[in-house]
């Protein structure tokens, strides 16, 4: 074990004497370097603060001059917090004496993590009232919000820490502050079921505002199923009749899909209907002109008799819940499409794939019409289709009875996936560049869909449609992680892992072949200057390497580390013996290598296209 690791472990475990022994006879410069170095992303002081080793913390600051503000990575409840300063870690873990010591040695009370979380917010999150009081006494700013605009008061309300919320309010916390998505502390109480804190917020002047989705605290409580909040707010004088009706209807939908309590749902729907009929002239509900096939053409019930009849048809009740939720929340709210997808998954689990696909396509329509390009929710929907189609194809291959996958079904989802890439890359400026992680995920999903399509028989017309779509996809020139083109991804084993369930296995010779046929650039480069051939070599796949070579790639072109594809082949694998460099090296390649090796001046002496060729061998 090296000295850096030994020092880190001693600090983490609170072994002061061992740490002193490790550092004896070390120069001040060596000690300072050890204090600033990170192991697993954390400094010794950060670890000692995280685990509450007071004597060790003071030794590190006083005798080792450990940097008191230097942040790092620290784990809480399985989540890695990046850029956390020692004071944040001590506050989150509830170590008051360590907090006092750090502040006494000059730690900034408002220093934040990478997500802009303060030590005060960390203490509020886990309910450490004594630390909250101490930090506020030492000028902690109550109103510093995290990157989502979520304040200390909001998190205290959401976590149900009544005493902390009361303390913050008494110290002047803004009771009506809004987050980035427009929600207030009242919304956090509603979503967590914290009724007593909600009553306190109202006494301090909290107002019932709508968030960015148009949700009031009452509707938020209905969505999360907190009946205590719904009962309280439906009787509150700030709540109008229309909102009371919507809240009860929405709560009934929550009872169907979240609590799986159909009888409970009926009771809330009856209460809503009684209120609606009590004001018939102004509370009439608008009906859609055409029933939605995805909902099996169901319509919302409008009379008490129709409502009573639902108990005999649980499936119709579930469609009622989806109809009600879409009407009240609208298609842009995440819960609307989420529960449509949830209901479709239940149908798939029972073998009713047709109903599942109809519902999922309807949810995908909503997402692509209302969400930003490359939304994680849209990507999740597209991945679910790929996983479902893979499962259905496996059943067919095993000879099991069940619905088969048609070429048209798969092709439609491929087209929808390509559309999502188009939406992302063709956004009008100054829109931000597409998120590389989400773009990479969607590119991988598309390759899995192409792989599944290659397993299905198709007519010449269908094959032409497929290849035109792939050509359109390639023309977008979208790249994923590390600048990987679709062809890079097709020959990389990491593309296999796109979700929780297996879809296709990569590297895929079939997918690489159809991409090349449709115009993929065989000499495209990633950010490390690797060609697809380099990636295929790293994966020890000689058949794909031969395919790429026959497609015109330069066998001896080098990457940023001056490595050829042959250099990357595993010497212990058979691939090395199957790929013979002499068979794929031209005189032109040898000449280019000689120019590079002897550092000959060639720019301006040869045609520009040959200059580019020489650069491939640098």
Swiss-Prot record:
Tell me, what is an example of a GO biological process annotation in this record? Answer: proteasome-mediated ubiquitin-dependent protein catabolic process
- Stored InterPro entries: Ankyrin_rpt (IPR002110), Ankyrin_rpt-contain_sf (IPR036770), TPR-like_helical_dom_sf (IPR011990)
Q: What role is this protein assigned?
A: Substrate-recognition component of a Cul2-RING (CRL2) E3 ubiquitin-protein ligase complex of the DesCEND (destruction via C-end degrons) pathway, which recognizes a C-degron located at the extreme C terminus of target proteins, leading to their ubiquitination and degradation. The C-degron recognized by the DesCEND pathway is usually a motif of less than ten residues and can be present in full-length proteins, truncated proteins or proteolytically cleaved forms.
Which organism is the protein's source? Danio rerio
Family named by the database record: Belongs to the fem-1 family.
Q: Does the keyword Ribonucleoprotein apply?
A: no
A molecular function (GO) held by this record is: ubiquitin-like ligase-substrate adaptor activity
Please give the SMART domains that the UniProt record associates with this protein: ANK
Record text on subunit structure and interactions: Component of a CRL2 E3 ubiquitin-protein ligase complex, also named ECS (Elongin BC-CUL2/5-SOCS-box protein) complex.
Q: Which domain of life is it from?
A: Eukaryota
In this chain the ANK repeats are located at 2-31, 40-70, 82-111, 115-144, 148-177, 181-210, 213-243, 482-524, 528-557
Pfam families for the chain: Ank_2, Ank_4
Q: Which residues form a coiled coil?
A: none
* Descriptive protein name: Protein fem-1 homolog C
Listed GO CC annotations:
Cul2-RING ubiquitin ligase complex; ubiquitin ligase complex
User: Domains: what does the record tell us?
Assistant: The first seven ANK repeats at the N-terminus (1-243) are essnetial for recognition of Lys/Arg-Xaa-Arg and -Lys/Arg-Xaa-Xaa-Arg C-degrons.
What pathway is this protein said to act in by its record? Protein modification; protein ubiquitination
What keywords is this UniProt entry annotated with? ANK repeat, Repeat, TPR repeat, Ubl conjugation pathway
The organism that produces this protein has a lineage beginning with: Eukaryota, Metazoa, Chordata, Craniata, Vertebrata
The TPR repeat units are at 245-279, 337-370
């Amino acid at each position: 074990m090296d000295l850096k690791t030994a020092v880190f472990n001693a600090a983490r475990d609170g072994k002061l004497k061992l740490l002193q022994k490790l550092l004896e006879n070390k120069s001040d410069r060596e000690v300072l370097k050890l204090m600033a170095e990170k192991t697993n992303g954390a400094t010794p002081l950060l670890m000692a603060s995280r685990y509450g080793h007071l004597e060790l913390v003071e030794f590190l600051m006083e005798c080792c001059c450990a940097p008191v503000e230097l942040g790092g990575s620290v784990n809480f409840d399985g989540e890695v917090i990046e850029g956390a300063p020692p004071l944040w870690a001590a506050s989150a873990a509830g170590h008051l004496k360590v907090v006092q010591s750090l502040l006494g040695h000059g730690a900034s009370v408002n220093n934040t993590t990478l997500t802009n979380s303060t030590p005060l917010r960390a203490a509020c999150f886990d309910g450490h009232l004594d630390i909250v009081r101490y930090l506020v006494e030492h000028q902690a700013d109550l109103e510093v919000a995290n990157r989502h605009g979520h304040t200390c008061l909001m998190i205290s309300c959401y976590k149900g820490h009544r005493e902390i919320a009361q303390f913050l309010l008494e110290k002047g916390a803004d009771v009506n502050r809004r987050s980035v998505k427009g929600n207030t502390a009242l919304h956090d109480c509603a979503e967590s079921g914290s009724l007593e804190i909600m009553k306190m917020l109202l006494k301090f002047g909290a107002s019932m505002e709508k968030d960015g989705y148009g949700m009031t605290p009452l509707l938020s409580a209905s969505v999360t199923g907190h009946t205590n909040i719904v009962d309280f707010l439906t009787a509150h004088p700030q709540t109008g009749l229309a909102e009371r009706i919507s809240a009860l209807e929405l709560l009934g939908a929550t009872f169907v899909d979240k609590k799986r309590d159909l009888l409970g749902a009926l009771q809330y729907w009856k209460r809503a209907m009684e209120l609606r009929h009590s004001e018939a002239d102004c509370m009439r509900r608008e009906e859609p002109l055409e029933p939605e096939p995805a909902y099996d053409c169901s319509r919302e019930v409008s009379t008490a008799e129709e409502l009573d009849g639902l108990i005999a048809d649980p499936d119709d009740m579930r469609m009622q819940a989806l109809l009600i939720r879409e009407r009240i929340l609208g298609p842009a709210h995440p819960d609307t499409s989420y529960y449509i997808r949830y209901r479709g998954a239940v149908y798939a689990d029972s073998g009713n794939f047709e109903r599942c696909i109809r519902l999922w396509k309807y949810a995908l329509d909503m997402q692509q019409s209302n969400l930003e390009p490359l939304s994680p929710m849209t990507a999740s929907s597209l991945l679910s289709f790929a996983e479902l189609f893979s499962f259905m194809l496996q059943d067919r291959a095993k000879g099991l009875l069940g619905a088969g996958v048609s070429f048209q079904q798969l092709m439609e989802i491929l087209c929808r996936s390509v559309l999502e890439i188009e939406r992302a890359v063709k956004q009008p400026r100054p829109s931000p560049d597409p998120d590389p992680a989400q773009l990479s995920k969607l590119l991988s999903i598309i390759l899995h869909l192409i792989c599944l399509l290659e397993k299905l028989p198709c007519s010449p017309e269908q094959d032409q449609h497929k290849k035109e779509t792939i050509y359109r996809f390639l023309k977008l020139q979208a790249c994923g992680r590390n600048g990987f083109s679709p062809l890079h991804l097709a020959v990389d084993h990491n593309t296999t892992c796109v979700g929780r369930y297996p879809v296709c296995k990569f590297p895929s010779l079939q997918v690489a072949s159809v991409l090349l046929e449709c115009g993929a650039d065989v000499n495209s480069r990633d950010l490390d200057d690797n060609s697809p051939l380099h990636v295929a070599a790293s994966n020890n796949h000689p058949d794909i390497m031969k395919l790429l070579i026959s497609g015109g790639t330069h066998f001896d072109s080098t990457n940023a580390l001056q490595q050829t594809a042959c250099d990357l082949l595993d010497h212990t694998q058979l691939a090395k013996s199957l790929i013979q460099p002499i068979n794929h090296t031209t005189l032109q390649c040898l000449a280019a290598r000689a120019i590079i090796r002897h550092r000959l001046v060639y720019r301006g002496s040869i045609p520009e296209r040959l200059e580019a060729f020489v650069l491939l061998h640098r």
